[in-house]
Amino acid sequence: SAQLQPGAKLLVRHELYEDWIKENPYDEGQGWGRVPWCQKEMDVTEEMLDCARRNDVSLVVIGRTAGEDQDNNAKAGSYCLTETEEDMIRRVCEVSKRTVVVLNVGNIIDMSWVEKYRPQAVLYVWQGGQEGGNGVADVLTGKVCACGKLTDTIAADINDYPSTENFGDPFKNYYKEDIYVGYRYFDSHKPFIDYAVQELGKE
């Protein structure tokens, strides 16, 4: 249906995903304690793009398989999007009335593509646990409001993080940013705007 109504029945193409998984089994990567990685993505077909054109909202899901105990590498498939992922976002944004990109990731990732392709919304879902899918559905359908302070600061560029310059030595960590580690660095800057509604008036 082009219009999502309460109680409406949706056609879900289960066989599409089942066939994909058979041909592209889950990649276990290098296991626990390794750098996060990504699974192989489907190529966007003309049939998919036609669905995106006809419907009110298109969802694009980007995922990372967290590798516990490791930070991202500044490489495609880890911190950066792969060419396939970026192409998927670009092509859907070009034809869809409204595009929502859902980031099913456990770490922050590069967000430079947002300015490039201008999706109408981006939803970071982090590690939602067994109820994560239901929580995402509640946000996307408007059952709950997606508001609140993020647990992480997502910088526009990886070089905006002060630790980037000194990161990557396999034997030592250099905290040249002193006590301004992580959120403390960003909290030392005043926010550029207040998200509350403001009015100017005369006393």
What are these regions (language model features)?
Residues 1-203:
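C-terminal non-catalytic regions of proteins with extracellular/luminal or membrane-system context
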